[in-house]
């Protein structure tokens, strides 16, 4: 695929912003690693060699009786000392770097939970004896995936709504504007509290609920671009030739409107991550037990005598938001028309 000179120039401007460029690399590497969280932090071995046979517990479930007739035909608990002793007597196991999952309760702690950082638990444990590092890894992945999904879907809905408003104008635009004014005034948090009293919000339920309100963030920007673009000469020429409205909007106006829209996406993503963390902190987010950065912040607040909880939550969440903001600033500079050759100052 051949890139246009303008696109190549924008990429060069983005790369010239070292802070944003390296922030993108760091964020991409961290997120890429978190996608393989089960291979990094898990209470199941990566690989087992037992009695001449190979087992991959991280990918497949095995019953305990597969490792000896003395065990019951139930799911293998690899944290059980007896099972581990039996396996190691006739073979060996390879464990992940962090031998705990986000739900694992650490056994045989030397101090009551929350326990401080140690060689066994690098970031300590929370008030339920769960490894903090494991919950951070899974919580980071969950927060980014949730924020990314919410950002993409809400942006798509917002672009469509703004495009319809700006392109058709008139009564269509007026009705949309009045609806947005009324809908944006709805008490989102109170509605979420009511919803939480009826059902337990899961990942998708919470995502759909927030989508009902988050789509309005980009509508005004897209609407303004379509209001401007629909009166341009090449758009009028396309209409005169009988090109359908959908084709005109998709091929002739939307590419220009997306330039302004793309600069908002990193900031929208950071806002989505912050929103999920805030709801989890207040107790209105994901179900209890889910790996969440906001829940870790709440634990830090409730356990002031365990400062590692608050510090970990602060630095992880602050670091994620800082990286996204730096990326957003670099994207904004790259799409700034004043930075392109021939642009008037």
Residue ranges and their predicted role:
Residues 125-345:
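Alpha-helical transmembrane segments of integral membrane proteins
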